[in-house]
């Protein structure tokens, strides 16, 4: 079971650690924070968000707005810079209909064939 909470701006009240403490969520074992980034951000913007979002619970990156990007090199760059795995890929106007697990196959097809997960039938299959 998962609950998604869209948090306030990363600069709100001292960053994610302060926000989590304020809402009584700090120190919870099963809490995971995921940084949502767009490949349309510049490298400087993505690195800025990563610096602001760093907290004990930061577990992965979710790439969003993939359908709006003209290239996907930032996915590789941020994976290296952050040391975080990619957990999900989102594209299109719907959250649930346009979200796929970030499997190896989905990432390879996106990077090398420029295919979004919704453009082939076995997008969620691990490979």
Question: Language-model segments: which ranges?
Answer:
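Residues immediately C-terminal
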Residues: 10, 42, 68
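NTP-binding/hydrolysis catalytic cores, primarily Walker-type P-loop NTPases
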Residues: 79-127
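Short, solvent-exposed amphipathic alpha-helical segments in soluble enzyme
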Residues: 20-22, 50-54, 76-81, 104-105
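Conserved beta-strand/loop subsegment of P-loop NTPase cores
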Residues: 30-37, 54-96
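Conserved ATPase-coupling elements of RecA-like P-loop NTPase cores
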Residues: 12-19, 45-48, 71-74
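C-terminal structured domains
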Residues: 18, 24-31, 39-58
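Switch II (G3) loop of P-loop NTPases
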Residues: 1-19, 27, 38-39
